[in-house]
Design a protein with these regions (language model features):
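Active-site beta->alpha loop and helix N-cap motifs at the rims of alpha/beta catalytic domains
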Residues: 2-168, 175, 287
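Glycine- and other small-residue-rich loops at beta-strand/loop junctions that grip anionic moieties
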Residues: 32, 58, 87, 162, ...
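Active-site pocket-lining/capping segments in soluble small-molecule metabolic enzymes
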Residues: 32-34, 114, 127-153, 163, ...
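Short, surface-exposed basic-aromatic patches at helix termini and helix-loop junctions that form
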Residues: 72-75, 99-104, 201-209, 296-303
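Conserved, mostly hydrophobic/aromatic
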Residues: 82, 173, 182, 215, ...
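Active-site glycine- and acidic-residue-rich loops that bind
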Residues: 90-93, 118-127, 188-201, 223, ...
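Hydrophobic, aromatic-enriched interface-forming segments
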Residues: 161-179, 183-205
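Substrate-binding cleft of secreted/luminal carbohydrate-active enzymes
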Residues: 270-288
């Protein structure tokens, strides 16, 4: 199998200065699920004050569990941003009920709107644009709405591996900025290689899409764990980064860390201050504590936990 075709290790690329990495990681966000959040004894010992915490809503997760997780994080002083996956929401009444629960029990004012991973919609919604068009988020006074981005495409949307449909959807969402009082941004799927990310971000800017980008980055994890998630999530060309790592026998059993991709993006951001990637969003595939600790060790002041500040 090509993945295990060992070769001599390449010379490591130079790392960006600590200050540049710290700047890119400032106000980073992280993603949890109710079951992963349960394993964390104290979020304030791990995350900086006011960190935005996304709560992924996997099909089958009771809304009660989602709201309870949101309430805990809100009480700890974090900005809570639950997922609203269109295809698992039955109808407008269900959406209104979820919003009311989140706001009544957890003071939620932010949301990530996305189609969701299921193939067949549970009801009347099939994409995030339909959720936005209900007007319910503005009616409830949401201050921030994020939408999904895919630096390497999404075959659930463009079966040919292209970007025609996914880019058209982003243009629609970009135009929606003028119809909502909420601040908007793109939160992306994770990728492992900076160059395709930079090219994608530049292409959006060239197409007139002005939404700021919160780039998805996989936190430290075992190589086999990352490969499993990358394939399941449709991560494309940047899988080569993992393949290259697997060719180095000395690294096979060591956890992957996002040092290189963060360093490359930080250097690009420092050289191009108007770069439209404004924040990092961490997917803690190797564990919440592992990802938070990595930021503490590599992000300078941007990683200082709330209880240590």
């Amino acid at each position: 199998m090509a993945l295990l075709n060992f070769r001599k290790k390449e010379t490591p690329a130079p790392q960006a200065p600590v200050a540049e990495v710290e700047a890119l990681l400032k106000d980073y966000s992280i993603e949890v699920m109710p079951r992963t959040a349960e394993k964390v004894e104290d979020f304030r010992a791990l995350l900086p004050e006011g960190t935005r915490v996304y709560i992924a809503h996997i099909d089958g997760t009771p809304i009660e569990d989602m709201v309870a997780t949101a309430a805990r994080l809100n009480a700890d002083g974090f900005k809570v941003m639950p997922h609203f996956p269109a295809r698992i929401i039955k109808d407008r009444a269900t959406l209104a009920d979820w919003i009311a629960r989140y706001q009544g029990e957890a003071d939620v004012r932010q949301a990530l709107l996305l189609a969701g991973g299921v193939t067949t919609p549970a009801g009347e919604f099939s994409d995030s644009m339909q959720l936005m068009e209900t007007g319910l988020f503005d009616k409830a006074g949401f201050t921030r709405l994020h939408v999904a981005g895919h630096p390497e495409g999404n075959r659930d949307i463009d079966a040919d591996g292209g970007r025609l449909n996914v880019d058209a959807a982003l243009k629609w969402k970009n135009d929606f900025q003028t119809r909502t009082d909420a601040e908007m941004a793109i939160a992306t799927q994770f990728a492992f290689d900076a160059q395709p990310i930079i090219e994608w971000a530049d292409s959006l800017k060239a197409a007139g899409i002005t939404l700021p980008i919160h780039i998805g980055i996989a936190g430290p994890a075992k190589l086999q764990t990352l490969i499993k998630f990358a394939i399941a999530c449709g991560v494309g060309p940047s899988l080569k980064v993992l393949q290259k790592r697997a060719m180095d026998v000395t690294k096979l059993l060591l956890p992957y860390e996002p040092t290189d991709v963060i360093s490359d993006l930080a250097a690009h951001k420092a050289a191009h201050p108007d770069f439209n990637i404004t924040h990092v969003h961490l997917f803690p595939l190797g564990g919440i504590k592992t990802s938070a600790t990595w930021v503490q060790e590599n992000g300078g002041a941007s990683g200082v936990p709330a209880d240590a500040a």
